[in-house]
Amino acid sequence: MYKRQDVDGIGIVRQNHTGLPTRIVRSHWNLGPTLDFDPARAARNIALGYLDTMRLFGRVGGTAYAILPDQDGFLAHFAETYQRILEQVNDRAPGMDRVERAARQRAGYPKPFAPNPSAPTRGALAPLELACERLHVPEDLSYTPKLLAATFLGSFDKDPADRFPALLDGKEGSLVAERAMAAAVPEEFVTALVSRALAETPLL
């Protein structure tokens, strides 16, 4: 198997004349300027390249983060809870499911698995990854789904879900204003959904 790293740069791109099947490793992350040899960035990019290669060959999962096997069924519980909360929000404010899909699309994450949105797939994991990316959870490490969730919960002081009390809890408030805010910054809405879902998903 012939592997090539897909890095933006200036110069000549050599064609693969080996006759071997080629798989191109693409990173979800911004790797920074090609000719800026900052040691910390270089170390990060080397780690990301390794993890991206492991993902390409099926050793880890995920879209942006390197996700290790889920040994205790945590992801299935999270996905089921997340989907239930999203459906409740959509009942209060029809169309919020489209906002959630827009967040996935804008950030480069897959759609939910259509036959079963709560199935423990890359699509089910995507909201958690998206929320972690938004809150700058380190991307050059590998995580189990549960560890990624715990790291996310430890990355903020003020709960992101507090920004959407009318949508998430049906509390008195401006549903119109919250819908507008969610539509303007759908990633923030998904982050709030993830926080609320994790609050209802046991980590221990």
Predicted features and spans:
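Patatin-like phospholipase
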Residues: 3-204
